[in-house]
């Protein structure tokens, strides 16, 4: 099952899967951020975080993204086993190298039930933290419903 989910995930990342997150994420998905200590539960909040990450760590389809392929978000390795995938990624943000992994677990229905992100090195974590905070603040009207503000 994970092979099909990851094929769909890659299609979503390329902008080729309409309503990709809605189709891929289980209603009760749990998102583990490298920045936020508390796991984020639910499709709506996970969608928000993944959309913010998509803006913070731009891929090839982003306007104004570097024409240098080595600076764009890209997956460099993947390991699929059972219902779990580990996808290693690299990118450059504001001249800083970012390396990390997405650990994705799906259920037997083909929905993502857990999404973990880990990032290195420390300067990348600090940069992504700052940019994610700015992006979430920009998305605040949408995010307030999730944080009870």
Descriptions of predicted regions:
Residues 1-149:
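C-terminal and inter-domain tail/linker signature
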């Amino acid at each position: 099952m994970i092979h099909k989910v990851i094929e769909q995930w890659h299609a979503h990342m390329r902008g080729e899967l309409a309503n990709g997150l809605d189709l891929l994420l289980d209603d009760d998905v749990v998102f583990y951020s490298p920045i936020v200590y508390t796991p984020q539960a639910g499709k709506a909040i996970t969608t928000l975080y993944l959309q913010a990450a998509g803006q913070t760590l731009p891929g090839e389809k982003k306007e104004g993204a570097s024409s240098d392929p080595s600076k764009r978000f890209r997956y460099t390795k993947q390991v699929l086993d059972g219902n779990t995938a580990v996808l290693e990624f690299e990118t450059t943000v504001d001249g800083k190298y970012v390396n990390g992994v997405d650990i994705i677990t799906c259920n037997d229905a083909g929905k993502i039930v857990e999404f973990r992100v880990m990032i290195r090195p420390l300067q990348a974590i600090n940069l992504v933290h700052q940019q994610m905070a700015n992006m979430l603040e920009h998305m605040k009207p949408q995010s307030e419903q999730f944080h009870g503000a």
